[in-house]
């Protein structure tokens, strides 16, 4: 049995791509998108007609509404292939505006509803800022489920769990990138692999905390750099994986066993933590990696959103 099929026995496998034509070969349960992945997809020849057609159909609407139409169109195509959920992201430029994030989420979910897609098949993706987490809490109370992304710090995970969000996406690879760059010539790749990888350790800590205290929020490891990071998190609730790494898993017959164990986590010696807004902001500020990576991630998604805007305006 290949590694992908083995992994599916332990974890819900999610495809991290806007390239929906690649999905069927991997048979994932869910799929995730973000502004960068959608931008990458629309720059490929096979998706150009979809972009052109969607923009033409909604010409005359304000730009931000046309963008949401494009994002949802990709989501609808993905949902024709995956049996589960798709994550569609709110504009990263709204990451510090709770009310605007809620309003944009309403618009996205209404577009899916107009297309006959139930709320249970859509996750609204929001950056894990304090403002984003408050928006998600409000949306969850309305029955609109959220995926809190750009999550790098334990404090972000604790706040998301307390807010009752459906799912979080802790970023394994970007955490790994930061520590590797910080260590420079002193980085020992072999010693820092697998369970010792700082990104893997972050997800494992969050997973254990949630299971210990019965927090229902799903943990979906994201942003992987290599197969070793994925197999080191086998047993996590979900893992969202790029097509390149899905293909590598599919090509390997190496055995995989569960690395995370909910029952063991429930017996772990962990103390409960709570954060109000000042405490959250201070904890995040104390974590240089998380502070830098959250800011960098928002900037990158905002820049790609602006590039997509320009592409649409040029049509």
Curated annotation (Swiss-Prot):
Keywords, alphabetical: Cytoplasm, Pentose shunt, Schiff base, Transferase
GO molecular function: transaldolase activity
Pathway involvement of the protein, from the record: Carbohydrate degradation; pentose phosphate pathway; D-glyceraldehyde 3-phosphate and beta-D-fructose 6-phosphate from D-ribose 5-phosphate and D-xylulose 5-phosphate (non-oxidative stage): step 2/3
Chief subcellular location: cytoplasm
Alphabetical GO biological process terms: carbohydrate metabolic process; pentose-phosphate shunt
Record carries keyword Iron-sulfur: no
Catalytic activity, reaction form: D-sedoheptulose 7-phosphate + D-glyceraldehyde 3-phosphate = D-erythrose 4-phosphate + beta-D-fructose 6-phosphate
Active site location: 125 (schiff-base intermediate with substrate)
Subcellular localization(s) per the UniProt record: Cytoplasm
Pfam families: TAL_FSA (PF00923)
InterPro entries: Aldolase_TIM, TAL/FSA, Transaldolase_1, Transaldolase_AS
Enzyme superclass (EC): transferase
EC numbers: 2.2.1.2
Disulfide bonds: none
GO cellular component, one term: cytoplasm
Protein origin, superkingdom: Bacteria
Family from the record: Belongs to the transaldolase family. Type 1 subfamily.
Subunit structure: Homodimer.
HAMAP family: Transaldolase_1 (MF_00492)
Primary role: Transaldolase is important for the balance of metabolites in the pentose-phosphate pathway.
UniProt cross-references to PANTHER family, sorted A to Z: TRANSALDOLASE
UniProt protein name: Transaldolase
Organism: Leptothrix cholodnii (strain ATCC 51168 / LMG 8142 / SP-6) (Leptothrix discophora (strain SP-6))
């Amino acid at each position: 049995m290949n590694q992908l099929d083995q992994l599916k026995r332990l974890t819900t496998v999610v495809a991290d791509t806007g390239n929906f034509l690649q999905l069927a070969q991997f048979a994932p349960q869910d799929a995730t998108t973000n502004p960068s992945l959608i931008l990458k997809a629309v720059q490929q020849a096979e998706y150009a007609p979809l972009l052109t057609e969607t923009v033409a159909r909604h010409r005359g609407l304000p730009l931000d509404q046309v963008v949401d139409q494009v994002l949802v169109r990709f989501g609808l195509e993905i949902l024709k292939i995956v049996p589960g959920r798709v994550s569609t992201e709110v504009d990263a430029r709204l990451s510090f505006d709770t009310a605007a994030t809620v309003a944009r989420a309403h618009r996205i979910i209404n577009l899916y509803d107009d297309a006959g897609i139930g709320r249970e098949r859509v996750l609204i993706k929001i950056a894990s800022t304090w403002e984003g987490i408050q928006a998600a809490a409000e949306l969850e109370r309305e029955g609109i489920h959220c995926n809190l992304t750009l999550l790098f710090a334990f404090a972000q995970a604790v706040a998301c769990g307390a807010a009752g969000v459906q799912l979080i996406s802790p970023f394994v690879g970007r955490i790994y990138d930061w520590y590797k760059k910080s260590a420079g010539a002193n980085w020992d790749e072999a010693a820092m692999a697998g369970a010792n990888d700082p990104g893997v350790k972050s997800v494992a800590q969050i997973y254990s905390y949630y299971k210990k205290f019965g927090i229902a929020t799903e943990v979906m490891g994201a942003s992987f750099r290599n197969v070793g990071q994925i197999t080191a998190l086998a047993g996590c609730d979900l893992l969202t994986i790029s097509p390149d790494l899905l293909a590598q898993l599919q090509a390997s017959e190496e055995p995989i066993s569960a690395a995370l164990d909910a029952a063991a986590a429930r017996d772990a010696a962990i103390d409960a933590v709570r954060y109000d807004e000042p405490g959250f902001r201070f904890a995040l500020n104390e974590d240089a990696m998380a502070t830098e990576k959250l800011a960098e991630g928002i900037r990158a998604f905002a820049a790609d959103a602006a590039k997509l805007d320009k592409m649409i305006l040029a049509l």
